[in-house]
């Protein structure tokens, strides 16, 4: 009998020692850093009263900008933009529309170059209700002047979307997509944009159908980020495009995963370029240094989209499309959680933007009925 008890005890010990690693205690969750978020107010622009609706924010060379529209009681819109030197005290810019559609523009994207603003706006109209797109640029007197374009430049039969705008050493770049594939619009000064589409690298081809999500200026020219859906497959691949002049583009597919991946936002951080998007079932970064791309770290398990990405405090701040937590990284590899001042709401009617300069970040959250802004100087990462 004693021998049976001993054998049984030995079996218990052996089984205890063979527990699978998955039964081990989970690693402790990092405590989010809590920056000193301060609410920011925007003055209502002159004109009929209405609700502010904001869509984008940007900063460079000591200037901050926010763009959107004013929605009146009847649902009418008019373009609106603001400027600040410290992300706290703001001044409404005077819009100067040059077309009937411009008078009703919703400014959807903002870019900055040498402390000057350029923006993309639109208003649905015409027989088919297609968006009529305009660009806007800062004038010497501080106003924001519409630059009307021929309908086919941004619209026409091949139109799909006109996305984000970025300033760089060679001027301005707008990223978007056409029925032919990816597209870019370039301008040296913002006075007139030229459409570049249906060219090698950007056009859909035997490799698959591309989609561009964002762009950034680099010391050597321009860079676009997005994805490629290979022919016969359902999972996308992360893709970057590079160009010296904005007219000839070279496409490169980056490492992804079996579950699919894409690039949604991109920024320059010092001498590096960092893109963020979805990798499988979470968000992740891809990092370029010295012309070579590599996979960076992952963060935000369960998240599939990032609403904003900005260079802040020598690193980058990413704001997912939904939830109470942002993420900060110094190098794109190790990410730490950052408590946001409010949970980012989900849904198609909401809009979120983030901009950064030095140690300061500006967060814009529009839930479709109310606009809120905050600025903070950090801290952003663990001590």
PLM segments and residue spans:
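C-terminal motif of bacterial Sec signal peptides marking the signal peptidase cleavage site
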Residues: 14-17
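Residue-level hotspots at or immediately adjacent to binding/recognition sites across diverse folds
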Residues: 19-383
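N-terminal export and membrane-targeting signals
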Residues: 1-11
């Amino acid at each position: 009998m004693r021998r049976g008890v001993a054998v049984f005890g030995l079996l218990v010990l052996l089984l205890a020692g063979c527990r699978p690693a998955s039964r081990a205690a989970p690693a402790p969750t990092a405590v989010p850093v809590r920056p000193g978020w301060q609410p920011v107010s925007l003055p209502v622009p002159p004109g009929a009263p209405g609700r502010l609706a904001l869509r984008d924010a940007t900063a460079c060379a000591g200037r901050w900008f926010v763009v959107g529209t004013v929605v009146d009681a009847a649902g009418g819109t008019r373009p609106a933009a603001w400027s600040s030197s410290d992300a706290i005290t703001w001044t409404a810019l005077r819009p100067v529309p040059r077309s009937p559609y411009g008078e009703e523009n919703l400014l959807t994207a903002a870019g900055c170059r040498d402390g000057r603003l350029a923006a993309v706006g639109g208003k649905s109209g015409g027989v088919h209700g297609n968006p009529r797109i305009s660009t806007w640029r800062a004038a010497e007197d501080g106003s924001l002047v519409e630059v009307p374009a021929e309908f086919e430049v941004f619209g026409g039969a091949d139109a799909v979307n006109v996305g984000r705008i970025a300033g760089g050493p060679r001027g301005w770049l707008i990223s978007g997509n056409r029925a032919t594939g990816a597209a870019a619009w370039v301008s040296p000064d913002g006075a007139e944009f030229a459409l570049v589409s249906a060219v090698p690298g950007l056009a859909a081809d035997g490799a698959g159908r591309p989609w561009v999500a964002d762009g950034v200026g680099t010391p050597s020219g321009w860079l676009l980020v997005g994805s490629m859906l290979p022919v016969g497959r359902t999972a996308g691949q992360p893709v970057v495009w590079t160009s010296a002049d904005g007219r000839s583009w070279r496409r490169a597919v980056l490492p992804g995963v079996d579950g699919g991946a894409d690039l949604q936002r991109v920024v320059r951080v010092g001498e590096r370029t960092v893109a963020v998007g979805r990798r499988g079932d979470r968000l992740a970064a891809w990092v370029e240094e010295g012309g070579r791309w590599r996979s960076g770290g992952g963060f935000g398990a369960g998240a599939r989209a990032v609403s904003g990405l900005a260079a802040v405090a020598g690193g980058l701040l990413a704001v997912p499309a939904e939830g109470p937590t942002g993420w900060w990284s110094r190098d794109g590899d190790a990410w730490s959680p950052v408590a946001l001042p409010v949970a980012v709401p989900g849904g198609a009617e909401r809009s979120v933007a983030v901009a950064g300069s030095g140690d300061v970040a500006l967060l814009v959250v529009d839930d479709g009925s109310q606009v809120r802004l905050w600025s903070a100087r950090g801290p952003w990462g663990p001590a």
